[in-house]
Amino acid sequence: MEPPPRLTVADYLAAAPDSFGDIEVVDGRIVRNMAQTELHSLVVRRLAAALEGARLPAGPCYRVSADVAVRFRDAVNSSPDHQLNVRYPDIIVRDCDPYDVNTVRDHIQLIIEVTSESTFETDTTTKRVQYAAAGIPGYLVVHFDKDWSKISEVEEYRLDWSGRRYVVRAVHHRALILDEPLRLTATFEDLQLP
């Protein structure tokens, strides 16, 4: 059965977050998530594992999750069925407060999106603006070469002085080196070789 073309806030809140299948909701519109390539999946898994391995036992406490629902602020719109915004980022790093789809955005320290041919425009424009407006401190975008066969670079964005826009902190080539919220060095080879 096909989902309705729009999803209201009330319908979303009345159901379990994972009951709608592979969709995102943008201003109430249902947007289907496309199946990803094997390389995309490999990079997401390896990067999430590297981030988990970078957590320090002494803290601070961070959780690393992949493809979990994150509800962003509702759109400013007078129609109740055009407001809901739910994304499933490839990877999130958040504090250890209990997970709640409606408030988790306030606990996220870093979001990572791994681009694909079907998500490139959204990952590099729309989501970058949305995540910054939500006040998420860091955003990484993993890019592939023109053949989509290997990682070419990772753009690292951090909030600017306003706390509402991202600026490029670094463009990583050959290795991702992070100092916050976790200290991590991961070569592109480690993230993508079978």
Task: Label each PLM-derived region with a short phrase.
Residues 1-194:
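Gly/Pro/Ser/Thr-rich low-complexity, intrinsically disordered segments predominantly at protein N-termini
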